[in-house]
């Protein structure tokens, strides 16, 4: 669920952006954008020339120079406005997060126990390692890990999702976020950060742009724009002696106008706004990016590692069948499977208990009265079970159970091997049940591939993105589901080490890899991946390792993250193409106007039939300023995104923004020229 979206032109934001745009007229602010700094310098110079003409210190048309100066200032203001509006939208989102931060007191425990003596201290005084007790109705004062207790927590202030979540000690759901509220029960929490370092603090800093640094692509584009600006500056500077030698020197005002119209002011003025808006759109999808670099990397990703459960399949695998080994009856298998699953709170574990009830009326036994030892599932052992009355019952993956049987001196039956293959070929997940060294049979867990996911993978393939399914299932099951879902490759029987090795393998081939994760065991792979989306419901280690956090904790969001990243890169590229193509029309407007008096042959370039030299120059300068305003919505919303191959996308954007960049100025400059003529300003 996403938080409330801001309107593109919120009235309050517009007023603030206008104020900020004026504040950004200072030289210190303009220096950060070299292209617009040149325009700013031209504005200052023409303003001084206007004043000198008005006071009679130099000859020239004060009205013409004054109008040129005014529109040059408008050009700078419009660029400032675009950046200020993008920043204002981000700050508004940050302010909504700041409302979550409340000055509160915390119960700091003197020992890591629920019943330990507590001191009431301001939440701001809590440090990493402090232990706090939080009760129903309290605001959780810090980020941390639950070390005792379990509670229902309202995280809507952070995630926008109204449904409460369960947070409890142990496992992957022990991480809590400061600023969320406990609805029931209590938690003992070990603070994991110092003041100012909480997840909420980092979210606010990121969204406000306080930590926004230029991304590598942004830096490369800025260098290109600076190079173009220097080239045009040198070219313009040589035109004055060139025209003077011809006997009719071009005025400084006209040369400044020519320079401003030729340098890439459109993309120069919108570049910063595009970057800020990209991070803002990511937040609109309920994803917090640690930097613009992370958003940009998402646009360059060409390998997606996707968890099978919850991303490709619905994630609610249910036990569908008991397939006993030769010499074992189905009821015996069901009874052992149910015992091994009594303490398993996963949907799969509960479904095994329920299936045994339905098939054989095996009632669920009281866990406490059994006096048994339960063995939890781990990523390393890949099995779980129970030790009860000298019985050692385990259920788990085929390889894990085979190793267990062989280590206990047993033999894995060939008929069970065949049953495992049959279940896997049908796309179900086989779990093998064993008692001691005796294999009892197979449980079939059936999962359902999400509707429409195959089409989404086909779209990603068109874009040149390889999809890899990550699953703990055996190779046969993984292959069946991979074929049904339409992924390009899969990693079966995945362990944290295998994921990390796979990421490094792709990166060694020069590819950019994106993945999701929520557990502490995912942290190494998340830290290695180029785009690492950690689930907000995951552990603190996972969130710290990733460079994005999905507040909805939805693994499928990774595909949307890639789309937003690509849209940002496409927007930047499209507007750069449009900006550079603009120069051609401005060239046809200003060159004849500036030099036709010296070289009448240049009148042939006046293909637009502009009214007069002054009108041509004014029209080009006015268009140059107005086009920034007209493109602000596109910079903030992003260009229309379609899943196409790189070559098809390039062709499409060249047609739309390249050809559009050529035609729009011809039309716009001519319309402005007609209006100026009608108003008597030509």
From Swiss-Prot:
A molecular function GO annotation: ATP hydrolysis activity
EC number in record: 7.2.2.6
Residues that hold ATP according to the record: 344, 348, 377-384, 395
Annotated positions binding Mg(2+): 518, 522
Catalysed reactions, as listed in the record: K(+)(out) + ATP + H2O = K(+)(in) + ADP + phosphate + H(+)
InterPro entries: ATPase_P-typ_cyto_dom_N (IPR023299), ATPase_P-typ_P_site (IPR018303), ATPase_P-typ_TM_dom_sf (IPR023298), ATPase_P-typ_transduc_dom_A_sf (IPR008250), HAD-like_sf (IPR036412), HAD_sf (IPR023214), P-type_ATPase_bsu_IA (IPR006391), P_typ_ATPase (IPR001757)
Keyword list, A-Z: ATP-binding, Cell inner membrane, Cell membrane, Ion transport, Magnesium, Membrane, Metal-binding, Nucleotide-binding, Phosphoprotein, Potassium, Potassium transport, Translocase, Transmembrane, Transmembrane helix, Transport
Top-level taxon of origin: Bacteria
Segments crossing the lipid bilayer: 34-54, 58-78, 219-239, 254-274, 588-608, 616-636, 662-682
Enzyme active site: 307 (4-aspartylphosphate intermediate)
Localization annotation: Cell inner membrane
Pfam families: E1-E2_ATPase, Hydrolase
Membrane topology term: Multi-pass membrane protein
GO CC list: plasma membrane
The keyword DNA repair is annotated on this UniProt entry: no
Subunit and partners: The system is composed of three essential subunits: KdpA, KdpB and KdpC.
Membership in a protein family: Belongs to the cation transport ATPase (P-type) (TC 3.A.3) family. Type IA subfamily.
Record-linked HAMAP family: KdpB (MF_00285)
The protein's role, per its UniProt record: Part of the high-affinity ATP-driven potassium transport (or Kdp) system, which catalyzes the hydrolysis of ATP coupled with the electrogenic transport of potassium into the cytoplasm. This subunit is responsible for energy coupling to the transport system and for the release of the potassium ions to the cytoplasm.
Name by which UniProt lists this protein: Potassium-transporting ATPase ATP-binding subunit
Organism of this sequence: Salmonella dublin (strain CT_02021853)
Gene name of this polypeptide: kdpB
């Amino acid at each position: 669920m996403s938080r409330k979206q801001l309107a593109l032109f919120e009235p309050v934001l517009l007023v603030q952006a206008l104020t900020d745009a004026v504040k950004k007229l200072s030289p210190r602010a303009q220096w950060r954008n070299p292209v617009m700094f040149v325009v700013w310098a031209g504005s200052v110079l023409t303003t001084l020339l206007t004043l000198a003409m008005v006071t009679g210190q130099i000859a020239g048309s004060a009205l013409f120079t004054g109008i040129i100066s005014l529109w040059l200032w408008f050009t700078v203001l419009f660029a400032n406005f675009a950046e200020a509006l993008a920043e204002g939208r981000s700050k508004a989102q940050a302010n909504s997060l700041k409302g979550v931060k409340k000055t509160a007191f915390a119960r700091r425990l003197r020992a890591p126990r629920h019943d330990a003596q507590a001191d009431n201290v301001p939440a701001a005084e809590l440090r990493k390692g402090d232990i706090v007790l939080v009760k129903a109705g309290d605001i959780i004062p810090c980020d941390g890990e639950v070390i005792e207790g379990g509670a229902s927590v309202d995280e809507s202030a952070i995630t926008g999702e109204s449904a409460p979540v369960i947070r409890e000690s142990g496992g992957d759901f022990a991480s809590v976020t400061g600023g969320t509220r406990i609805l029931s029960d209590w938690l003992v929490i070990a603070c994991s950060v110092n003041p100012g370092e909480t997840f909420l603090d980092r979210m606010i800093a990121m969204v406000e742009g306080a930590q926004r640094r230029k991304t590598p692509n942004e830096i490369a584009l800025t260098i290109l724009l600076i190079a173009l600006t220097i080239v045009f500056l040198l070219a313009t500077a040589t035109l004055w002696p060139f025209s003077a030698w011809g006997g009719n020197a071009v005025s400084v005002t006209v040369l400044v106008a020519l320079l401003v119209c030729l340098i890439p002011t459109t993309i120069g003025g919108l570049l910063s706004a595009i970057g800020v808006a990209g991070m803002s759109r990511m937040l609109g999808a309920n994803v917090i990016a640690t930097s613009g670099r992370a958003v940009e990397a998402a646009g360059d990703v060409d390998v997606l590692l996707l968890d099978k459960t919850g991303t490709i399949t619905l994630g609610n695998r249910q036990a569908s069948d008991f397939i006993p080994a030769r010499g074992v009856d189905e009821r015996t298998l069901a009874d052992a499977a149910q015992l091994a699953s009594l303490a398993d709170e996963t949907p799969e574990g509960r479904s095994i208990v329920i299936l045994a009830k339905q098939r054989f009326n095996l009632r669920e036994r009281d866990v406490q009265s059994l006096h048994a030892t339960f063995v939890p599932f781990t990523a390393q052992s890949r099995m779980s079970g129970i030790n009860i009355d000298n019985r050692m019952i385990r259920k788990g993956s085929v390889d894990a159970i085979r190793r267990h049987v062989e280590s206990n001196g047993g033999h894995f039956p060939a008929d069970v091997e065949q049953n495992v293959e049959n279940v896997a070929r049908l796309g179900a997940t086989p779990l093998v049940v064993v008692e001691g060294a005796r294999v009892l049979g197979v449980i079939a867990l059936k999962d359902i591939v999400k509707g429409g996911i195959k089409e989404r993978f086909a779209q990603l393939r068109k874009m040149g993105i390889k999809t890899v399914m990550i699953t703990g299932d055996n190779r046969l099951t993984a292959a069946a589901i991979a074929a049904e879902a339409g992924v390009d490759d899969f990693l079966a029987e995945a362990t944290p080490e295998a994921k990390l090795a796979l990421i490094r393998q792709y990166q060694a081939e020069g590819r950019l890899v994106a993945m999701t994760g929520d557990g502490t065991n995912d942290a190494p792979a998340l830290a290695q991946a180029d785009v690492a989306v950690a689930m907000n419901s995951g552990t603190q280690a996972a969130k710290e390792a990733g460079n994005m956090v999905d507040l909805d904790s939805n693994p499928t969001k990774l595909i949307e993250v890639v789309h937003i990243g690509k849209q940002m890169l496409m927007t930047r590229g499209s507007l750069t193409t449009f900006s550079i193509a603009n120069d051609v029309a401005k060239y046809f407007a200003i060159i004849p106007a500036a030099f036709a008096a010296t070289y009448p042959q240049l009148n042939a370039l006046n293909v637009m039939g502009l009214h007069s030299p002054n009108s041509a120059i004014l029209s080009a300068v006015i268009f140059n300023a107005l086009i920034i305003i007209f493109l602000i919505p596109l910079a903030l919303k992003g260009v229309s995104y379609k899943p196409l191959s790189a070559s098809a996308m390039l062709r499409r954007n060249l047609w739309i923004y390249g050809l559009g960049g050529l035609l729009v100025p011809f039309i716009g400059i001519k319309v402005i020229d007609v209006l100026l003529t009608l108003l008597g300003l030509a």
